Structures are given as structure tokens and as C-alpha cells.
Amino acid sequence: MRRLPPKGDPAYIKKSVDASLLYLGVDYIDLYYQHRVDPDTPIEVTVGTMAELVKEGKVRYIGLSEANPEQIRRANAVHPITALETEYSLWSREVEDKILPVVKELGIGFVPYSPLGRGFLTGQIKSFDDLPPDDYRRYYPRFQGDNFIKNLELVSMIEQLAAQKGCAPSQLALAWLLAQGENIVPIPGTKRLDRVRENLGALQVSLSREELARIESISPKGAAAGGRFPSQA
């Protein structure tokens, strides 16, 4: 898989925003993210440019994605950061030690992407062959070989707990995320309306301390086998 490098220089940001406004046919963007931090452009320059767009009325709020604690603090010192988007789920819990405390301290909303483990935590994927030949997930370590088998065992236990709770595995996974903090707003992706409704049902799932402890025992930090991204990333 080929991944394009992030760009955060002023010229690129301004060009991208203008193009987005034209494409969407709107006067402003509610929340504009810098998706991945550009290693070649100081974060202060990137956020400073985004702040100018706020003053111009083209952008209302600024967000970052996959930024580390130092970058978050430096960015927030230039202009208030409204949201940080980073992967977080029952099988990707790396943010808990350093990222979540910082965003909570600074009053920044946290937006977990891939809250359902790229679909794995839904219980709908039972074998590698369930993934279409052109599916990007085939390149991800957690969906390959022995990692897949081990992760399937983890999901099986989540499915059992969800069945006892009377909800879908996806709803249990999302409810767990929502229980981690009031500033957390997960963004599960889907192409189907019935899945949207199912995901929204997570708002009606309340987890007790005992249930949260049970989930913790099933999927503690580091429980997932394999890395988050392909080695090329």
C-alpha cells in the first residue's frame, strides 16, 4: 500500500480549503482537520494558517489527527484545538496513557476513528476470505495469519458478552468507548443505513462497573495481535 505524505504548509492548506468549499458548495467548513502532522512544517505554522482561515470565516473550528502530546500542546498554544481524531477502540488503546489525559486537560474533544476495529469488532468477519480481493484490510497485520485467529478469539468473547447484554457486538464496542469520557465522540464508518441505526443504538447501551471490568479482562491494553498499520505505513 502506498501512503501519501501529509502536507501542512500554508499554500497547500489554503488551496485545499478553497477547493473543499467549492466542491461542497458551502461558505465555511465547520471543523477542519489537519490529517496527520507534516514533519516538514512546524505545527505552529500549520495551525497558524488554519487560524487565519478561521478569522476569514472559511473555517469555524480546528482539529488535528494522530498528533502526539507535544504537538497537541504546541498547536493549542497557537489557536484553540477543538478536536483530536485518532484511532481508538477495544483493540487499539495506545492513546489512553498520554493522549487522552492531555486532551482532557486542554478541553479538547476526542474523536476515535475506526472505533469498530475496521469492522473486526462487529463480529461480521469470520475468515480472511470474507474480505474482498481488493479490500485494503488484507494488508493490515491484524487481519493476517495467526494474528487474525487470535483476534477472532478476542472478538468471540466480545460477542458472548454482547449476547448476554442483549445488544450487537458493535453496540457494545461503541458503548465502551462512550464510557471512557464525556469528551469522546466516536465516528464509525458505514455505507448502510441499517448499520447507522445499529450504531446509534449504542447510545442506549449502559455498561455497569462490573461489565466494564469484564470487558477490561477480555480486551486489556495490548490484547490485539499485530500492528495497527502495514509495515509500509
Regions found by a protein language model. Give the residues of each.
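Glycine/proline-rich, positively charged
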Residues: M1-E94, K98
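Short, hinge-like loop/turn segments at secondary-structure boundaries
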Residues: P6, V78-T82, L100-K104, K126-L131, ...
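Conserved, mostly hydrophobic/aromatic
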Residues: S20, I29, P42, I62, ...
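Proline-centered loop/turn at the N-terminus of a beta-strand
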Residues: R60-Y61, G109, A168, V185
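Glycine-rich beta-alpha junction loops
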Residues: N68, Y88-S92, S114-L121, W176, ...
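Glycine-enriched alpha-helix->loop->beta-strand junction motifs that scaffold or abut catalytic
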Residues: N76-A83, K104-V111, E182-I184
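Aromatic-lined glycan-binding groove of carbohydrate-active enzymes
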Residues: V95-P133, A168
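Terminal-tail/helix-coil boundary detector
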Residues: E105, P133-Q164, A179, N183-I184, ...
